[in-house]
């Protein structure tokens, strides 16, 4: 099994194969991807769809000297397997294992780290221009999907690249939804080879030189050329950006891909190759339902993904989806917006029931936020369902278009905190810090399912931009209450009181997901625990009261410490004039790798045992007593 694949330790081995061996290799590679993902979980449909394209790129181009940038990056498992990581695939997305995305520190073949969409053309153009300036003769290649091509950044890069006439840049549009092109056929293949050939490029340049003295004739020739292309492909748009458009071609046909790429390799200037692929190619279950098989957990390939038993605990995403439908039922002004994350954000049912108030704007986070602002000016109640990591992409719009104008937009921020297998690129570590400094913002962090529901309802009542953050995955098991209750603005609650004598009294000020582990630490240490609820406005009165009645304060959040919720508490403490020793616990000043979320939180000292350990070492150990007494004497 995998007789050919076992001989490939790097692309140099691949390039030594006979062309006739490449399709059997593709079959083995596809089977290996399926087997690997079924054992570890991960992205499947997109990787099954890029097998032949990956083989062709590494076969034709001299990687890693020639650079390949994979947009989004979740389709790079075949690339990883062919570039020396075949025997590490068992550790894919596991703690201390290889990443599910390209990572420069992992391999020289991962030329640029990706995970968010639409960045590849900008990066590849920078590489192409950089190579020119360095006097290096290498190709830079961006592989981008048709979904990612909807984002403005991709077109900004295309606009810039089109005037770089000598750059050895190739943009490959991996069209896996047939959303742009007509069906692929023999005529398309023939035209693609013709357009990528040196004769065509030279002939076109020669004709333009000859006809430059007769502009009307030249314009006629250009129109005829566009018409010829337009019969089979929508080339005009990409040609207008200054690219030579080639395709579409079948992205699973190595006999089309390889000669076309070989022709392109001999050209200079920006080239645009349109390939059509099928998500889930070669695995019928994934072909039939590429969404279901987009990012599965472990499963049996022979049986396929089986329906999971209904979990005892709702996920926070489900809580959001149910809340949104309930609010929309009550109020016709409620509008739901998602940047291409309908399933992930829990909006499937909302789309079915309120189709005229559901807007999937595509991979366009900046537009989503400003679009919501526009809706708010017309008296509607827009709710933007967005992952924490993707809200980063719309920071200027959050400030300039929504907060500056104090528009009542609700931001339902999913995947707050650590997200597990997707790793640092998708961690929701920074939203509290980057939102807290924005005037007019109200920010809440949910500690359980019902609190999440009531916070979302509270947010919808506010006259200003308001955010509610909640984590990925299952909740704590708390039942949601159908009736809505508005939470008093900027008010936390004490969930546990200490019985310790003076000198040993510790108060833990916990935010969101950190309330549960803080309560565990509070039980172990007999400490007071407060559920702060609001990051902005922070409950300054509660901070002061806890400072006045306790000897030590500890803030705990599942977000970056610098500038986060703990900083808000310390600022309130300074304002109060009550001075107490404070520990700020949260995510450290580093990017947290992929792995099991519970294990990662424990590694960061943010489980119950870790919180108790930090408090004990800092405030309650004999050494801490000595240090504290020394400070008091001083």
UniProtKB/Swiss-Prot annotation:
Molecular function, one GO term = magnesium ion binding
**Record keywords, A-Z:** Isoprene biosynthesis, Magnesium, Metal-binding, Thiamine biosynthesis, Thiamine pyrophosphate, Transferase
Q: Which SUPFAM superfamilies does the protein's record reference?
A: Thiamin diphosphate-binding fold (THDP-binding), TK C-terminal domain-like
Q: Which pathway or pathways does this protein act in?
A: Metabolic intermediate biosynthesis; 1-deoxy-D-xylulose 5-phosphate biosynthesis; 1-deoxy-D-xylulose 5-phosphate from D-glyceraldehyde 3-phosphate and pyruvate: step 1/1
What is any one GO biological process for this UniProt entry? 1-deoxy-D-xylulose 5-phosphate biosynthetic process
**Cofactor: binding details:** Binds 1 Mg(2+) ion per subunit.
Record field: catalytic activity: D-glyceraldehyde 3-phosphate + pyruvate + H(+) = 1-deoxy-D-xylulose 5-phosphate + CO2
Listed binding positions for thiamine diphosphate are 74, 115-117, 147-148, 176, 283, 365
Signal peptide start and end residues: none
Keyword Transferase among record annotations: yes
Q: Which CDD domains match?
A: TPP_DXS (cd02007), TPP_PYR_DXS_TK_like (cd07033)
Entry's EC annotation: 2.2.1.7
The cofactor named in the record is: Mg(2+); thiamine diphosphate
Q: Which residues bind Mg(2+)?
A: 146, 176
Its top-level enzyme class, in one word, is transferase
Q: Name one GO cellular component term.
A: cytosol
Question: What sections of the protein cross the membrane?
Answer: none
What protein family is recorded?
Answer: Belongs to the transketolase family. DXPS subfamily.
Function text: Catalyzes the acyloin condensation reaction between C atoms 2 and 3 of pyruvate and glyceraldehyde 3-phosphate to yield 1-deoxy-D-xylulose-5-phosphate (DXP).
Which PANTHER family does the annotation name?
A: 1-D-DEOXYXYLULOSE 5-PHOSPHATE SYNTHASE-RELATED, 1-DEOXY-D-XYLULOSE-5-PHOSPHATE SYNTHASE, CHLOROPLASTIC
Q: How does it assemble?
A: Homodimer.
| Protein name per its UniProtKB record | 1-deoxy-D-xylulose-5-phosphate synthase
- Which species is this UniProt entry from? Burkholderia ambifaria (strain MC40-6)
Q: Supply the gene name.
A: dxs
């Amino acid at each position: 099994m995998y007789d050919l694949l076992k001989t490939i330790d790097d692309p140099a081995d691949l390039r030594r194969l006979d062309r006739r061996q490449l399709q059997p290799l593709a079959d083995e590679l596809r089977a290996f991807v399926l087997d690997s993902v079924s054992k570890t979980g991960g992205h499947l449909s997109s990787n099954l769809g890029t097998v032949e394209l990956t083989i062709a790129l590494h076969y034709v181009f001299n990687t890693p000297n020639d650079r390949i940038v994979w947009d989004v990056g979740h389709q790079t498992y075949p690339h990883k397997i062919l570039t020396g990581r075949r025997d590490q695939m068992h550790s894919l997305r596991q703690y201390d294992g290889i990443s599910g995305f390209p990572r420069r520190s992992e391999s020289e073949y991962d030329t640029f780290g990706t995970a968010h969409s639409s960045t590849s053309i900008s990066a590849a153009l920078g590489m192409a221009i950089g190579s020119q300036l360095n006097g290096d003769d290498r190709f830079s290649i961006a592989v981008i999907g048709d979904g990612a091509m909807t984002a403005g950044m991709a077109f900004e890069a295309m606009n810039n690249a089109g005037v770089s006439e000598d750059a050895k840049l190739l943009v490959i549009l991996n069209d896996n939804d047939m959303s742009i092109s007509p069906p692929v056929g023999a005529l398309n293949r023939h035209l693609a080879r013709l357009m990528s050939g040196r004769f065509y490029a030279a002939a076109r340049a020669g004709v333009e030189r000859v006809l430059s003295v007769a502009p009307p004739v030249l314009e006629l020739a250009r129109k005829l050329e566009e018409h010829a292309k337009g019969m089979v492909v929508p080339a005009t748009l990409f040609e207008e950006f200054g690219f030579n458009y080639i395709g579409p071609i079948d992205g699973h046909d190595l006999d089309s891909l390889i000669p076309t790429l070989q022709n392109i390799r001999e050209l200079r200037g920006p080239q645009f190759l349109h390939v059509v692929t099928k998500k889930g190619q070669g695995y019928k279950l994934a072909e039939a339902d590429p969404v279901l098989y987009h990012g599965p957990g472990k499963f049996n390939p022979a049986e396929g993904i089986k329906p999971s038993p209904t979990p005892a605990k709702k996920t926070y995403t489900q809580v959001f989806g149910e809340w949104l439908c309930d609010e929309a039922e009550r109020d016709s002004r409620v509008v739901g917006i998602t940047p291409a994350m309908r399933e992930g954000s829990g909006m499937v049912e909302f789309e079915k029931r309120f189709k005229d108030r559901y807007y999937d704007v595509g991979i366009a986070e900046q537009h989503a936020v400003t679009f919501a602002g526009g809706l708010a000016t017309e008296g509607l109640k827009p709710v933007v369902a967005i992952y924490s990591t993707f809200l980063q992409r719309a920071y200027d719009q959050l400030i300039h278009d929504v907060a500056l104008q104090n528009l009542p937009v609700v931001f339902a921020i999913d995947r707050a905190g650590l997200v597990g297998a997707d790793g640092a690129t998708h961690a929701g570590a920074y939203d509290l810090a980057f939102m807290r400094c924005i005037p007019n913002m109200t920010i809440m962090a949910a500690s359980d399912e019902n609190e999440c529901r009531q916070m979302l309802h509270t947010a919808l009542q506010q006259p200003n931009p308001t955010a509610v953050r909640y984590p990925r995955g299952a909740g704590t098991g708390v039942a949601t209450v159908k009736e809505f209750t508005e939470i008093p603005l900027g008010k936390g609650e004490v969930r546990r009181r200490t019985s310790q004598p003076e000198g040993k009294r510790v108060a833990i000020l916990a935010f969101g997901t950190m309330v549960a582990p803080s309560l565990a630490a509070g039980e172990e240490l007999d400490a007071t625990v407060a559920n702060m609820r609001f990051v902005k406005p922070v409950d300054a009165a509660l901070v002061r009261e806890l400072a006045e009645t306790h000897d030590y304060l500890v803030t705990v959040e599942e977000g970056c410490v610098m500038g986060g919720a703990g900083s808000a508490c310390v600022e309130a403490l300074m304002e109060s004039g009550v001075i107490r020793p404070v520990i700020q616990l949260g995510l450290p000043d580093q990017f947290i790798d992929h792995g099991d979320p519970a294990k990662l939180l424990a590694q960061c000292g943010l489980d119950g045992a870790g919180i108790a350990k930090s408090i004990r070492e800092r405030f309650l150990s004999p050494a801490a007593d000595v240090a504290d007494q020394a400070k008091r004497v001083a």
